[in-house]
Amino acid sequence: MSQIKHCKIEEIPAGHKCEHEGYEYFRRKFVPFGEAKNTHVCVYEIPPLKSAYPYHFHYKTEETFYIISGTGILKTPEGERKVSAGELIFFPAGEAGAHKLTNGSETENLVYIDFDVTHDLDVAVYPDSDKIGIWGMGINKIFPMSADVDYYDGE
């Protein structure tokens, strides 16, 4: 992206994802992956009692959430706590930045902006389900952590 970008949130089309029980979101991609060198910015709207993603951390990506409206339950390595409109939350790369944000309301959507500092390739770990994900450079794969093979397997 070689120019300044400006718009109202409602002008960005919202993509909807609902593929697994307990997980659902509407995402507006303001700065999609690949449009800027190291930045990815999206606005998420999470329906009541749902989460966008499972508990996870990234090895390279840093994330910052700004809660626009609603209330959520934030799970981190320190436990769970409530979050609400006006709060900023930073997740560093690595295990210390593990997180899962769930809409805690039964009636109101949780809306937040996700600002990511990205890299060409990232690895995410899902501690609760013992999985690992690899993204970037044409790769989009998730494996169980137990999927260990010998370095020369298949050579």
Describe the predicted segments one by one.
Residues Y53-Y55, R81, A124:
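Short beta-strand segments
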Residues F26-K29, C42-H58:
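Conserved short histidine dyad/triad with adjacent acidic residue
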Residues L49, G72, G94-G97:
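Short beta->alpha connector loops
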Residues V43-P47, H58-T76, F115-D116:
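Short, conserved beta-strand element in jelly-roll/cupin
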